[in-house]
Amino acid sequence: MISRVTYQGDLRTEAVHIQSGDVIVTDAPIDNNGKGDAFAPSDLVATSVASCMLTIMGIVSKRDNINIVGTTAEVEKTMSSSPRMIESITIKLFFKSKLSDKEKKKLERAAKTCPVEASLNEKIKKKVEFFFHN
């Protein structure tokens, strides 16, 4: 078991990571009867894609001694209304370190092997943009 999720009432859940005890709270979004006080479950899906990409790039950067510390991802998600589902996810990756062309290509390839992104429904439009420091 990786987590235990408990419904707290009022469209809010609390997920506990069993190994670490870390907690994630979700709330329904305002456009779906919620308060929007925390990540919506669909926000976590989109955010998980970015986190996965950064993690996979981190594995490659550690192996190949490439500095990507401080790299950030901005995540955008749109929902469709009928059926209500994620319509599109856009990830913008911003690198703070100066990287060679070879390192850039290596990191771009790594990001595109993210298993979370590969697991998403093919109907979801996905866009990834890379912004490298000059």
Question: What function would you assign to each model-found segment?
Answer:
Residues 1-47, 58-134:
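Extended beta-strand/beta-hairpin segments
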Residues 55:
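Short glycine/serine/threonine-rich phosphate/pyrophosphate-binding segments
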